[in-house]
Amino acid sequence: MINKLAILGLMIIGISCESREEITRQQYVVEGMNLYQTNCANCHQVDGSGLKDLYPPLARTDLWQRVKMSELACIIKHGQKDSIQVNGKPYNAYMPANPKLQALDIAELMTYMREKWSPNKTIFSLDSARYALKNCP
């Protein structure tokens, strides 16, 4: 009984030592993974490798350094009709809009994708998502 209480106490201490932002980031990653699998993986693949010449990869690309995160948020929400270059290769397939995704969904999805494929592993905050979506072209 004492061992169980000690383990529970250590778990509570471990959890309480993480910052609120880190806990939120971890929650966003989990929710974002579910959103990615539902909304993005059919075209961009579960591993982010894309689909041959049709849909661009998200993993191992220059996209994360070259394109503003606010622009990617707008593309996710409103779709993309124009060609996009990834790793120097043009992709011309139409990306449909995701009108049902709200700012929180975009924040979670972007945080997950950053965690998986971007060198910048920080949270894409709800405020950042709201601002980006408010200012989409």
What is the predicted function of each stretch?
Residues I2-L8:
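Sec-dependent signal peptide recognition
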Residues L10-E18:
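Hydrophobic h-region of N-terminal signal peptides that target proteins for export
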Residues C17-L35:
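Electrostatic cytochrome c docking/interface patches
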Residues R20, V46-S49:
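Cys/His-rich metal-chelating microdomains
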Residues G32-V46, M95, L109-M113:
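The canonical Cys-X-X-Cys-His
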Residues G50-S70:
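N-terminal, post-signal-peptide region of Sec/Tat-exported proteins
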Residues D53-A59, K81-K134:
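Axial heme c-ligation environment in periplasmic c-type cytochrome domains
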Residues L72-K81:
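Solvent-exposed helix-loop boundary motif
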